[in-house]
Every structure is written in structure tokens, then in C-alpha cells.
Amino acid sequence: MAQQQSSRLNRLLTLLDTGSTQATRLTAAKQIGDIAKSHPQDLSSLLRKVLHHLRSKKWDTRVAAAHAIGAIVLNVKHPSLSELLNSLATKLGEAGISDNVDEVVAFRNLQSKILANAPFRSFEMNKVLEFGALLASGGQEYDILNDNSKNPRDRVARQKKNLRRRLGLDMCEQFMDVNEMIRDEDLIEQKSNVPANGVGNRLYANCSPHHIQQFVSRMVPRVNSRRPSARELNLLKRKAKISSKDQAKGSCEVADVEMSSSHVASTSKRILSDSLDSSKADIGNEDDIEPDGDGKWPFHSFVEQLILDMFDPAWEIRHGSVMALREILMLHGGSAGVSTEEFSSDNGFELKDVLNKVTREREIDLNMQVSENELEPLRKRPKIEDPSKSFIDNTVLEVIGGDYDINVKDEDAEFLLPPVKVNGQTDCSSTKLEPQSSMDDSTSHSEINHVAEVNNHFEDKSFIEEPVIPKQQEENLEVLDLVKQARHSWIKNFEFLQDCTIRFLCVLSLDRFGDYISDQVVAPVREACAQALGATFKYMNPSLIYETLNILLQMQRRPEWEIRHGSLLGIKYLVAVRQEMLQDLLGYILPACKAGLEDSDDDVRAVAADALIPAAAAIVSLRGQTLLSIVMLLWDILLELDDLSPSTSSIMNLLAEIYSQDDMTLVMHEELSLGEEQNIELNEMGHIESIGERRDVKESPYALSGLAPRLWPFTRHDITSVRFSAIRTLERLLEAGCRKNISGQSKSSFWPSSILGDTLRIVFQNLLLESTEEILECSERVWRLLVQCPVDDLEDTAKFYMASWIELAATPYGSTLDATKMFWPVAPPRKSHFKAAAKMKAVKLENEASSILGFDYARSSASLEKQEDASARSTKIIVGSDMEMSVTRTRVVTASALGIFASRLREGSMQFVVDPLSSTLTSMSGVQRQVGSIVLISWFRETKCKAPSDGSGSLPGFPSPLKKWLLDLLACADPAFPTKDIFLPYAELSRTYTKMRNEASQLLHTVETCHCFDKLLSTNKLNVESVTADETIDFASTLDLWNKESAGNESLEKQVFEDVESSRQQLLSTAGYLKCVQSNLHITVTSLVAAAVVWMSEFPARLNPIILPLMASIKREQEQILQQIAAEALAELIAYCVDRKPSPNDKLIKNICSLTCMDPSETPQASIISSMDIVDDMDFLSSRSNTGKQKAKVVLASGEDRSKVEGFITRRGSELALKHLSLKFGGSLFDKLPKLWECLTEVLVPEIPSDQQKIDLKIESISDPQVLINNIQVVRSIAPVMEETLKPRLLSLLPCIFKCVRHSHVAVRLAASRCVMTMAKSMTTDVMAAVVESAIPMLGDLTCISGRQGAGMLIGLLVQGLGVELVPYSPLLVVPLLRCMSDVDSSVRQSVTRSFAALVPMLPLARGVPPPVGLSKDLSSNAEDAKFLEQLLDNSHIDDYKLCTELKVQLRRYQQEGINWLGFLKRFKLHGILCDDMGLGKTLQASAIVASDAAERRGSTDELDVFPSIIVCPSTLVGHWAFEIEKYIDLSLLSVLQYVGSAQDRVSLREQFNNHNVIITSYDVVRKDVDYLTQFSWNYCILDEGHIIKNAKSKITAAVKQLKAQHRLILSGTPIQNNIMELWSLFDFLMPGFLGTERQFQASYGKPLLAARDPKCSAKDAEAGVLAMEALHKQVMPFLLRRTKEEVLSDLPEKIIQDRYCDLSPVQLKLYEQFSGSSAKQEISSIIKVDGSADSGNADVAPTKASTHVFQALQYLLKLCSHPLLVLGDKVTEPVASDLAAMINGCSDIITELHKVQHSPKLVALQEILEECGIGSDASSSDGTLSVGQHRVLIFAQHKALLDIIEKDLFQAHMKSVTYMRLDGSVVPEKRFEIVKAFNSDPTIDVLLLTTHVGGLGLNLTSADTLVFMEHDWNPMRDHQAMDRAHRLGQKRVVNVHRLIMRGTLEEKVMSLQKFKVSVANTVINAENASMKTMNTDQLLDLFASAETSKKGGGSSKKGSEDNDQIAGTGKGMKAILGNLEELWDQSQYTEEYNLSQFLTKLNG
């Protein structure tokens, strides 16, 4: 079983690396976690295997491997420290001890003593950076093997070639000469001095990674409570060896600085390899990662290995290890070090001993005496006395006890404490912040003896105070033990966390790898390391938090930007994770982040801003000068940013976060009020400016007029994230101002008037140009906020900009926007040049690696001045060039915004809008009319919404002429003349009209010149100058008719007609296109004009001019957004007409309801959908929700597709109209519009209990099912938009709809099912209650197939449509579905199987959900089904199936489990394959379940019909079955009839059928008597050796599949013998359709597996094969039970298989060589390569290719291997006889000669084997003693002729003493069992000769213990079956199997083919099929759903690669160059992996 489990694990591990999608990889990772859960004993091995993938070069593989580690950790349970303390608290309470847990355990004392020895005290950043190798790329990809060539010229030539290859120049050789690019002198080594101004390559080249390992190990506690293991001792030896090498290398460097580069390379390479050996040595063998002891944290050893990998030179290995540590710490950070070992009170454990040992083992150099004051808890915060100084001289907090070459006096200790909180403010006055001027590398060791003094602290008796717990009572002793355990675990956890923290800090300091692929650098190692550090922060003691923060602050002072970047990453996760400590930490974090914000490096600035975002609320709470200085700093940074600054988005996000805080509103109000009374000097507020600079009051962060414009340049930034940040920041500023106004805190405008105009212009341009939906929606919200400003300010803006805005909005498609009317903001003035000079100085300092450290150097730098003249921008913006955004959507958004703006204006300023609107509406341009109409619609709609009381949206000052003009436009119904009294088309169509008229003129000219159409022209005159599209089409059509009439006139020239026809077709095309475009444009324009008239609420007397355009838009408008406008206006119009007489409403409602049925894809067509096959073929059962997200624009196609698209548009428009009607009328919808209810109840009748029969009659009496379907579709369309109060009324139609679910017509059933599904989405509780009560019983109605089909269809749609909302109902649906999975109807089976697959994963979720409301108690609490579901979810609770009868044998455990499984299948009417190994009792288990069922039925009074059972088996086994049943089962229960014999015998036996309840027959009999046997309905139909039906096309298979039975069971030890298609045939008998059709199965599984078998297959093919194999395994797993003898029979002797190789005899060799020269040789070779037709699984390949003689030749070869006479026969042809006579000297009779055994090496080998067994030799040995150890032998052959030869030539000639029997096909079946019984009962019979075919089926021959296979079958399972005749239950001796194989022949190929087939079979059916417990019945989804997923992922095609090969050709061309390019990096991979909110969600669980 372990081997099988390993096989599955290996496949999952392969998917981690080769999965085509990240989802595939993560799914594999999750399943690896499940393996860890089910096999906890293999944890160490599992981790080791995943560790390999953590070191992969591929990002996706490492991420998936880290997720796999997380999944493993999730499934490994270990108590955490908090759980341990909670249990201690409980015990203390039970013991009556009232002390606090902290006091009892003495944590405070523990903390103070441990901190005195904290490794942070000895952590020195300079030492880490000096001795640690910088970590960037490992550089191995650039290593070059040493060139030992003695000839310098050859060496240079080789290097030139290598360099050309690495530079890619070898690809260019065919295009240009590359020899001169690299010259010899370029490669000659030039000596140069080491650079004087930097470290050069010293840190990279000469430092082994183990320098840092050794250095860190001195600082980090390594607590070992045991003697070092052998692995650890070896590791120490390796470290010592490396250390000695490093020292030797160091001395060498001193002696010779100018050592050659080759020597340096070899040295560094040697060190690198050594370090890699040492770091990776721990994973060399499976046992290297030692399993941790019982009770200890199980990941300790694994984490040690990961920590080693953290310092690997290769960044990928560092990245993988840190990600794995992150996953472990997230989940088990609180469990690390926690021990569950028992600490008994007498085991000698004393805490002081542990602490002393800790101290001794640390080996820490302490450079100072630790005073008592410094051991106090760290809780105070520094007070900022002078903010200006504290933020400038912002230095590191020197936490107590650290010695960094600064002398700290005891009296200074009070200044070194963390800050305290004073009146809610951060008080930093007590902090001593002195700059550290130098950090040299010298470290004094003179005070090392202070270690002893510190040790004395641990000897302090007061420290080990025992709690006051009386020890007399036993329970108190238990408490005392628990206290000791808690102390020990606390110390271990504390030390582990600080160990990890130190190492994370080292990586953050040393890592230099950065990826510059995106706008902002991403440092994956540092980011992942910071996340891991964040995970430790969650569990870390506050004292450790301060220690860690101190080192992070040290890192912030370093000159290297990477270290500053890493420190701020750590701070970011600290702030995010420990929010509860934020107020205490803020005093330290703010100065560091402010310094980061002013850093010279932009990436540091970005991460500094990101770090403060989680602290925004805390920053605002500081108020005062601190808040002001931070906010002003952020605003000032915006001045310095340019287009390439990656920190832009982060800075603005932080600003937005700060301004969006609720407290910020109050702060702004207070500060502005204060600013009105006094002048504020900003420099006095703490923000220090450069020399000579001052700011005035308007730059206060609370007076935005001078600051907000700094956002303008970023609103149209090239980077999407920057644009969104800019507009989001603006929105938050406006929201803060609105809140201030609403709360009454301010009476003035919340937005400065001076910048309102510019702000509106900027936002309008965003609406005009933006294509990103998120930014566009934000811009709309900002616009609405801006128009809330005072009307006076808005009117000023309208005066200047409204006309230009309308003109911009109306710019036609393809035209350029007028840039002069747009606002290009001039960048605000930059800071002074002094800042630029400061930056240059800072950069110079950094380049020189200056030792002058501190925050001030970074602050003094700023970005260089870069003045940009915005007015010089000459960007051309073409409307429609951005294809991401619909031009129509842009027009609607901008025009609607202008309407909203206009609604705020007063009557006096209305002219600013009306004048430009008049010009657009009177224009000939359709686009301008659209824009003008939309402005009016938005304007009047806003006005009406503000004054809804009178229902009028009219404006008194709106000009009447404009209203009249709108009505005049509506009166123009002809699209060709859309303007009153003007006979011109729309301006947009003028070009197309010109083109059409030119073509018409050309055609007319051609017709006139040929004089063939003079008569036609005289009657049809065409005015080319003014012709319309309709007239043109009419003329061209008339010309076509005339042309056909004149075609018979032979005098007309053919060329003339061709010219005329060509011109005519071109003209028709142009005119048709013009007509279509013109019609669509006219519909759009007129519908918008009509909508504008509707919203004006001034209707004309006749409503037709308004109604017709609106309805036309509902039917044909392609743009959804315009259709929505028309639908809303139509609802408004209908509301107006409710009280109008006469009212058009009834007709309108009728038309709208009719239009909902126009979409054939949503409304089933009864004339088309006439059967379930059509439903399945056309995929109508996919849940296409008619209320989901619709396409924004639909492009019309042609033909059938065009009608579908038109139907879709019409339905979409009508549903939008219903939606707006519902919104308009609400609960009074049916009262105001009674016609709508009439349409809903046209056929469907509301529920009336007394009229149930009438309802049924009415529905069935409807002759036209389409009427019923249309009625149902109207209900479906209106259900989602119905107001809540009306839903009960709609629910009254449900009973009638459920009647339609079981309607006789399939289209009605489909429509009703879709309708119920749609209703369930909006009325889940009520509809699902009705489903459970009405639809579920339909599934069990065996009398109504249409009801079962409809119910299956309905549930399938519900599962797809409702998804997780179905969770509470899933327990009620699963069991009924399960019972229907074997329904006789294939469509029912298919639908319920899919539904069951989707429901099963919901069951675990349903366990914690209360039962759904609205159901009766009987329905919601079915005890029997509940118990089954519990077993399904938790298979450890499976009960043994109680047989209803007693067996005459004691069942073994595995046999009971087999009966449990059979009982499971029986209960739920499922069917399966019992495929235990041969000899495990399949017959017994099957007989037992049949007998139990018979007894159960006999005892049941309800069961009237007692059906017999039929057992079909090979004819040899008929008697065996009868014998077994009689042996184990009570004959009174099962009465057996053997239905075999001749036809006459069988006819006579039929009379006895009624007297027996078990019929045993053979496959041949079933084939012959199928007509008779199919008349019966059988209870059980059992197929023994069921693989006989593996060929789906055989007559036996066809006959067996016709048998009808309630329970179908297959017994087979080998369900897969040759190929995977055999499994399909077996399941087609069990559950037809379960694995799809044969073709679908072949595509899903057969082809991928066959492709993957090819050794040259691609990685994608290999992955597809793995996925297909895994999917098939899961699909069939619950229906296959497989146990092997090795797993379940521990007392079964082993089976030893020995292959004996023989060499061909001379005669055989001669015949073999003769064949090799024959013509059949080539064909045979090809067949062997494709594995023969049987194995390929593709019936179309080999059989058509291979001729009959080829198969005969194959048989010839196989027979020849066994014996020459098998191929020669008794008569040898003359040529062959003469050849053989020449070979054999003195041979006269060749036949007689060939009968000698030496001509068949196999006979010789057989003789040897028999003699070894003591058979055939003399009865006594030479010394007269009797031979012992007598064996009995089975000899198997494929052919009877070989058995004849063995009898005659071996036994009778040479081994006459052998006694034997024979069993082959010549023995009649009835006699075969007698021979078996005789052999088993008579030990004097030595040998039984059998053919594999006869002797391999079900026989029990355990009396034999030796088997000899003379020949071998292509099918390996036949040989295995034959072996298991002896190796089975009852065997007492070791079984020896001898396989005789001829070396170098076809037989060897047969044996290799057998291995592959066995591998496939074992993969599909493996150890997971061993029992119900291992089948993962809780994951039944995978078992069903995998069929569909594998169809998508399994059938990969090679076509793409083949096409590429053809295109690219071969050789060195473009294909070779492109082949070496990697795929572009997907930025989303970084975004997803390093998302802070996702990290926090996962961390907090």
C-alpha cells in the first residue's frame, strides 16, 4: 500500500512542477496536504520530497511547493503555547488555585533573565555585512568549466566560441560576420588593481555562505537537550572543514593580492560547491531529515534545513526556503518548541538546569555588564520634545544592553526605554537619540568574562520560585508537572522565535536580489522574508518585538538602499500584524518611515509609504504638529515625482488613507478655524525646509487649494495604478469635506472655489478618456461630489467650460479631440535647486560607501529638478482608438455627467447649457443629437428626482422652441431624411452616400453604353444625385430580374453581363450596408430624443411618435447602455399613461411580454427540441442565466447566427423594460398594470388546492406546447426583478410550473426547469422548499420517466445556478440523486451524476449549517439519510454490514470490509467491480451479499416479487461456484441451478427456473440464450472474471449488457488487462453513460495516456497523461474495491518470481535468422513499436494496417521460442529440411531428431527445475536416504501442442517416474472441476499440465507450490491470474514461479510490454481502493467531476507545435532564437503573492 501511495504522491509532486496552470499546481498542493493527514507517520519523507521543489528555478513551482508545505502544516496538529496555558489555567481552577497563570509560571522572571542573554545583544550589523556573503543571484549560470588546454590559441578560440554563444551571436552567423566583434586581445587577461573606492568583488567572490552561518550561529541559541546526532556531528565536521579552507584562502589573499582570476574562480567555485554540499547534505537521503521525537514539534528538523537554505547563494533556493518558513510560522508559530512530553515531578527536571545549559551553549560575547535597571520590562515610549529635532536627528533607538561601540552608562538607562503614552499623545522626551558616528569592525572581547556574571542571575533562587501548590494531593502534582511543562515550552518557543528572527534580519540585510520587471522593483526574497518575519511577530513576546525593531532601525541607517528597503519591509509587516501595539511603537516607526519617505531611492520611498498605510488611523490620532509634518511631507513628495517614479501610487494611497479617516475631518476643521485667527508658521510646526525657504498659510494640509493641484498630473498617468490612486485620493478629500459640511462644522464651501473649475475639468477629462472601469466609476462619484459645491461657483464654471465640454463629448468616432479645449495642468513649481544639489551629494556619498550614517543624509536628498512645459504637449487623442472602452459608453457617461451638472444650475444661468445644446440638437450629425439628448435626459431626470411630489420634471425657463424641435425630429420617420423640411441624411453617412451614388452612376453608365437595357431604363429612371438606399436596392434588384430574362438572348455579349453583374453586386453591398447603418443610427437618435421628451413630461396628443422609437430601441438597439435608457423612458411613459384614456399600456405590456420569448437560446422551441438527445447535444442544460451580465454591445452576424443575436437583443431589451417597470411601480405593479398579471397567467393557474385536477387537465389539454413555454418564459423574465411584496403572488404559480416539469414534451420540461432555477435565485427559501417537496419525489417515481427526466434536469440547473447557496439543501438532495445514478434512462443518469458530483463538496459545509427554513420536520430530518451522510463525510464511522444469514465460515477482516462495500452499493442501488487479488475470496463475498439480500427479501412482507439472481462465469467455473455456495451458504436460503450443457439440456432445465433463486451459467450460454434470459428481471447479476466483456464490440459483451438486473456486480482480479478502454466496457455494463460514450472516454483518457507513454512526448503531453490518469482514478474509485494479498494476508507465504533466460538452440537460431530476412519483418517491427492494435486503444490504427500474415508471423516467432516443432509441424519442407540436416551431423530423420530435448532449451530448463524439486529423479539418493521437501508443480503453456511435446518428449522419454494430470481446452467444461479436485486431493500427483487460458480462470490449486511458465501471454494479467491459482488463500508454502524466456527474442519485448500494462492498471486501481475508509468517500466530487475536467485538460494536441515547426523551419534561424527566449513575466504573480490584506487574512485564519 505504501508503494501505491507513493505512486500517487509522485504524480502530485510532478504536478507541482509541470501543472499547466497555477490552479492545477495549488490543487496538487492541497492534495499533498491531505496525504500528510492520512499518513502522519510519513511526514518526514513527505517534507523531504517537497523540499526538492522548493529549490526549483521556476517561480510557480516554488510557490506551489510552499503552498504544499502550508497544506501539510495545516493537517498536522500540535498543541500551541496558548492552548497549553489555557489547559493549565483550567487545571489551576480545578485545583482551587486562584493565582494568575503568568504568576504561577513566573513569566516575568523568565523574560527578564532570558533577555539578559538575548542574542540581539550580540547582533552586530557591521559584522554581518563584513563576514556575510551578499546574496543576489547564485551566479552558477555564469560558471565556466576550467579549460585545461595547454595551447593558448585553442583556449582563446574556445573562449571566443563560448562567448559568442552566450551573447547570442551564434544565431546571427548566417546574417552577418561576427568574427570581428570579439578579438583575441579582448580575451587576454589584463592585471588591474582592486578598486580603491569600494568593496569590489570581495564580498561576492571570497566569502563563503557559511561565514554568515557561523557568525549567526554564535548569536543564536542552539539548545540541545540531547547528545548531537550523527547527522549533526557530520554537519559540524563539514563546517570545520569549510572554515579551515576559508582561513587558508584568507592567508593566501594576504600573501598575493593579485592572484589570477582563474585561481580566484576555482577557489570560489570550490568553496561554493563545498557550501552547497554542506547546506544540501541534509536532504541527500530519506532519513536525513530526522523525524522529531514523540511529543516534540514535528517540524523542528525540517525548519533547521530551511534555515540553512536561507543563506544559499542562489536566490531561488533562498526564496523557496523563506516561503516555506512563512507557511510554517503562520500556522505553527505558536506551537514551535512546545513539547507534550510529560514532566513528572520526580524526573529531575529543573528549570534552572535548563537555563544554565542554555547559557553555557550560547557562546555569546557580551561586551558590557547588564545592570538591573536594564532588565525592567520595556514598555515606555520616547517623548518627542522638539518634533523638528527628533525627526531630523532621527536615530536608532538603542534598546537596553546592546553594545554597538557606544558607551552606555547605567544612569542613561532611563532614557533608553520604550515610550509611554501621555494624554493620548506620543511622548518621546525620555528617549536618548544620539547619532552613531562610526561602526568600525573591531569588537572588544575583554569583557567576555561577564558571561559568568550573567550566569549567576540564573542561579538566583528567587528566579526558580516554585508556585505555592500543596504537593500532597495527586492532582496538585499533576498541576505542578503542567507548570513545568508550560515553563519549558515557553522558553523553547521564545528561543525559537528569536532564532528565526535573527536569521530573517540577516537575510533582509544581505539579500541584494531585485526584479525590475515592473514599474516598481520587487525583491521577492526580502518580501517573502518580511512576510515570514510578520508571521513571527504574531506570536512574539512584546519584549522581542522591541529588540527586533531596534535592529530594523539600525538597518535603516545603512547606506545600501537594499538594506533600507528590507528594514522598511519588516516594519510594514510589524505595523500590519501588531496593531494592538501600534500606539507604543509609533514613536520609533514614524521617524524611520519619514526618513524612508525622503530617501534618495524611489523604491525605498514606496515601501515607506506602504508601511504607514496600516497605521493611518494611528497617525491621525496624533494630531498637532506631528500629523501636520507627515501630511505636508507627503504633499511635498508629489512635487518631486516624475513619470518614472514608482512610489507615486504608494504616496497617494497613503494620503488617501489618512484623509479618509473619520478623525481627520475634525482635525481639518479645528486647524482651519485656528488658521483664520492667527498666522501659522509651518516651520514652527516641525517641518524644516531647505535654507531660505518658507511657506505661506495656503500650504497648510487643511487648506487644499494649494495642495490638491499636485494631484492633477497623475490623473492621466501612463500607469493604471497611479491614475486610480490619484482619483481615489481626490475622492477621499472630497468625502472628508462633505462629511464636514453635513455635520455642520463648516458653513463655507468644502472645496476651494479657486480650484473648482480646474478640478471639474480634470474629472471630466477622466470621464472622457478613461477606459478602466474602476477608475471611471470613481470619477463619476467624484463628479457628483463636486457638483454639491455652491451654485455660484458652479455657474462660473459653466459659463467658461460647458460649451467646450459638450463639444468634446460629441466628437465623432475616429476624429481627434480638440486639445485646445482640454486642460493640461502645468506642474506646480518644484523645490529649489538646493535639493537637487543635496541629492547629487547623497548619491556621491553612497557610491563611495561613506561611513557617515544617519537619516539626515537620506533626507537631504531629493529628486533632480525636471521642469516640464505642459503647454508644449501635442498629444493627439483619437476617439475610439482605445478599443477597451466603448465609444457609446463614453458619450453616455460624459453627457450624463453634464446633465447632472446642469440640474444644479439656476434658471438665470440655464442659458450656458441651453445654447450649446440647441446647436447640437439642430445639427445634422446623429452623434451630436445623441449627446444633446442624453444631456437633456440626465438633466430632467435629476430635476424630477429632486422634486418627485408633483411628478413633473419640467423647467420653467426651458425654451419652448427647443421642445418643439424635439417633437419635429420624432416626426421624421424616414431614416434617409431625419430632419424636418431638409432632404439630407445624417452627416456621418455622407461619405457612404457619395460612394453609393458613384457606384450607381457607374452602373447606370455601363447599362446605358451597352444598350441592352434601354427598355428597362425607359420605365425605371434613376436620379443619381438624390437617390436613397432603398431606391438603389430596388433598381439593382429590377436589373437582376431583367438580366435573367435576357440571358437567353445569345446575341448579348457575355462580358457585358459580367460587368453589369459585378457592378450591380458591389452597389447592392454598399446600399445594403448603408441602409443597415442608417437604420441603426436613426433608431438610436430617435429613441434618445423620445426619451428626452418623456423625461420633460410634456407629451403631445398622439403618443405614437414617442412609443415607436422607444419600442424600436427595445427590439433592435445593439448597445445595452442605450437600450437601458430607452427601457427606463418607456417605464416612465407607461407610468404617465396609467390614468390616460385611451391608454396604450395593455398593448405595450403584451408586446413586451411577447418580446421576452424571442430568444431561441433561452426560450425552448417545441418544434426543434423534441427529445432528450437534442437537449444533451445542444447543451441546453448549462445554466445560461437570462439575468446575468449581458454583453454591452452585440454585433450582428448573418444567417442563423443573426437570428439568434437579434433574439438576444430583443429579449435583453424587454427584460430591461420589465426591470424598470418593477422599479417604477414597486408593490403596485399588478394593480396599476393588470395586463401584466394576465400575461403571467395566460395558461398557468395560481394555486387553488381544490382545483388540482383541473390544473392537470388544463396543462395537458393545451395542444400547442409553445404557448405553455412562452407563458413560463414570461414568468422567468419577471421573477428576478419582482418587488418583495409581490413575490408571494408569483409563488402561487409554482405548483403549476412543477406540473410542467413532468410534462410529456421535453421542451416544456426544459422551460419549466429553467424558470424554477431563475426563481430560486431571488426566492431561494420558498422555491427550494417547493423543490424538495415536489421535485425530489419525482426522482423516485419509477412509473413516470418524464417526471424523472424533468426532476433531474431541474436539479442539474439548480446546482449550476445557485452554487454555494445550495449548501443547506445539499444533504436533502444527495441521497435521492445517488439512488438515481443507475436509472434505466441514460439522460436521467447523466443529469443526476453531474448534479451529485457538484453537490458532494458542499456536504462538509452543510454540517455546520442549521437545517433550511420552510421545510417540514419529516423532510429536514431523515435519520437514515443523515447517518449515511455522516459516513460519507467521515468514513471512520462506517458500520459493519450485518448479514441477514449465518455463514459456514469465519470472515476475515478484509472480507467483512468487502461486504460493507457491497452493502453500500446495494443500499443505494449502485454497481461496482470487486477486483481483489485472485484467491482472496471474491466468490465468498459475492455469495454472502446475495444470500443476505435473499434472506432480507424473504423476511420482508412488503416484497411481493422475489427476483432470482444470475451468476455468469467461464464454463470451467460453473461447478466451482455451485461448490463454493454449497460450502459456505445455507442451502435452504440459496437454491442453485447450473444452467449449462447442450441446447436440448438447457431447454429442459428451464422448467426448473422457478424452483431456484440462483442461476449459474456461462458466458457462451448467455450469448446463445440471450433472448430467453432477458425475459427475466434479475435481482443480482454477477459477472465472474468480468474482464471477459472487455471488448465492447464482442457478441458476448452485447448479450451480457442486455440482462436486466437491480444490482450489477463484476468480479475480476484484473479489470484492466491491455488498455484503459477495457475499463469503459466494464462500466458500460455497470452504469451506462457514467464514463461517457466510448468516443468521449477515448478522447478524455485513452489518447492522453497513449501520448504520455511516448518517451519523446512533450511536457504538456506528459502532464496531460498524469492528469488523465489521476482523473480516471478518482472517477472510478468508489466503484472499485481492490485489495492485494500482500496488504491483507500477513500469513500468506511470499511469491518468488524468477526469470530463467535461455539461449536459442542452433536449430531455433537458424529458423529465426531465416525469418529476419523475410518481408514480414518490417511490418512486425512497426507493430511492436505501436504496441499492437490491442494496446493502442485506437481501433482505427493497427488493424487496418496489419495484414493477416503479419499476425501469423508474430505467432511463428513466439512458437519458435518454445520449440522448433511448433512451427515446422510433422512435415518439414525440403529447403528447410536440407538446411537443418546440414547443421545436424548424421541426421537422417529430421522430425525424429527435433523431438530430442536439446533442440528446445526450454525443455532442458524445465527438466532441471523438476529435478531441483525432486520430481522425476530416482526415488532415493546415492546414499540411500529418501528425498525430502517434495514439491508439486503446475506447468503452463499457451498451446496444447507444447503440452503434447512435454508429455511425449520429456515425461515419457526422460522422466517416466513423473505422475501428472492435464487440463486444457479439450477437456469438456463439466469435467474440468473434477480434475482440479482430483489433483488437490491426491498428493501423489507431481505435475498438472495446463494451458494458460483454461487454467487461469478462478481455479483453486493451492496444493501446488511451484509454477513453470513455458510461454507468455501478450496480456500480463492472464499470466498473473495463472500464478494466483496457487498463490491464494489456503496456500501454506512459499510459491516459486519460474518464467522461461528466450534471450534476445520477441519474448523479451513481450515481457517489457507487460510491465507498462501492469503500471497503467496499478495507477488507475491502486491501494486507495482498498476499503471504504481509504476511498475518500468525502471527496466524491472528484470521482464524478473529473470526467469533465479531464476532457478539458486531458486531450492535449500537438498541432500547435507541429505548425510552429513548419513555419519556423529547422536549423539556426528565427525558431532557434525564439526558442531560447523565456516567457514574459506576469506581474500578477508578484501582486497575488505579496498582497498584504491576503497575508493578514491567512495569518489570522
From Swiss-Prot:
Residues the entry annotates as binding ATP: 1476-1483
Q: Describe the location of the Helicase C-terminal domain by residue ranges.
A: 1805-1976
Question: GO terms for molecular function, please?
Answer: ATP binding; ATP hydrolysis activity; DNA binding; helicase activity; TBP-class protein binding
Motif DEAH box: positions: 1584-1587
Q: Where is this region: Disordered?
A: 1990-2011
Please summarize what the entry says happens upon disruption of the gene: Impaired in root growth and true leaf development.
Enumerate the subcellular locations listed in this protein's record, separating them with semicolons.
Nucleus
Q: Which domain of life is it from?
A: Eukaryota
Q: Which UniProt keywords apply?
A: ATP-binding, DNA-binding, Helicase, Hydrolase, Nucleotide-binding, Nucleus, Repeat
Instruction: Write down the EC number.
Output: 3.6.4.-
Q: Which InterPro entries match?
A: ARM-like, ARM-type_fold, Helicase_ATP-bd, Helicase_C-like, Mot1, Mot1_ATP-bd, Mot1_central_dom, P-loop_NTPase
Q: Name one GO cellular component term.
A: nucleus
- Signal sequence, start to end: none
Start and end residues of each Helicase ATP-binding domain: 1463-1633
Q: Where are the HEAT repeats?
A: 3-40, 41-78, 584-621, 702-739, 1288-1325, 1367-1405
Swiss-Prot/TrEMBL GO biological process terms = positive regulation of shoot apical meristem development
The entry's function note states:
Involved in meristem development. Acts as a positive regulator of the CUC-STM pathway in shoot apical meristem (SAM) neo-formation.
- Give the protein family: Belongs to the helicase family.
The name this protein goes by in its record: TATA-binding protein-associated factor BTAF1
Annotated source species: Arabidopsis thaliana (Mouse-ear cress)
Q: What is the lineage of its organism?
A: Eukaryota, Viridiplantae, Streptophyta, Embryophyta, Tracheophyta
